Structure formats: structure tokens, C-alpha cells
Amino acid sequence: MQSLSLLPLISLVYTSPLQLDIATQRRTKLSLETDEEGTKSALQQRLVCYERTGQYGESYAYTDYAPFLNQFDNRIQSCCFDGIWILYGDVQYNGGNTMAHNFWAYGENYCTDMPSSFINQASSLRYTGHPSDMYRDSINMYFNEYFMGEEEFAYNDAPQLNYDNRAQSIIVTGRQWWTIYQYPNYQGYSACLAPGNNGFPGF
């Protein structure tokens, strides 16, 4: 178990996984065999989005945060997900417009059309969790509801957060549970947060 301070969010400890829109298919070039301990092999975060449904038309691949989609702004109709990705209806992850829509999904070569209300709506996007391994333990705290706006994340225990009392939504990745605390140095009220099943994220 790991720890962190939170509750109004100040320290943290982690502890294991919840889920959302998941699909597990085999990638063509990366083995997803489980290791000797039964855990999934590392899976690089990567998102390929298309200008038409059914993964047709012009496409663009993302492996990092994209606060602006530039020439692909308001053009995404479908995507293939490797990892855990959030797409936002406004630039900079809806940080300046928390009324804008967003959409998140995850999986291993999981391809899907955007919901009808989100077709041609995405203006920014980012992954959550570790960039080189969607199955690695992490806690990702967002300063608005529904994983919008600025964030703070941790892969290990943290007796004090950089941004006190800011988290309004959280995603947990990996298999470890996390304990969040009201005050620094693991003091005050606490709560445990679990990831999803089988190494998938908890929202």
C-alpha cells in the first residue's frame, strides 16, 4: 500500500484497481503476455485518432500531452487506444472551460468511434498514468471534476503534495491501492483508493 496526503489533499500512500471503457485485444507488434507473476507486460501509451468513424481517413498519432490539437482540432471521429487517454472539448484540457465535454477510454489496441455528442469536438488530449507503462502504479489528481484542468501525480509515497487542497477527481493505475490523508506526513482523516480489476485503471 502507498500513501499520500490529500483529503483536502495533502499526503499519500498506495495500496490495488475500477474501470470504464475497456477492451483487451492483442497488439500486432507488442507482446502482451503476462510475466511470471501474472502481471501484464508494460504497454506504451499511444493514441491514434482519425478524421472519420471506423478508423478511416487522415490520422494522427499521439504519445504525449497535446494541449492544442492545431490542424486536427475538431476533426476527431474515432481513435485506437493503447493506454489510458482523455480527450477534451476545449484546449488545455478544459482548464478554462469546465462546462466543455470530455471522453475517456483505455485498452490495448482498443478502437472505437467517438460518442455522437463528441464527434468533431476534441481540442486537446492527454494520457493518464506512466508514459511508458499504462500498468504501472500511479495516482493522478485533477484540479477539476471529470479529470479536467491542471493535475498532480505520483508514482511513490509523498508525505506532502505540491498543491494542497486542489484535487477534485482522481485516477488510480496499476494494482496498488493508495491511501490519501487530510494533512501532511500521513496525518488526519484518510481514505483508500483502489485501481480497477486486472491492472486496469480506477476512476
PLM region spans:
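Compact beta-sheet-dominated domain cores in extracellular/mature segments
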Residues: 2-4, 8-203
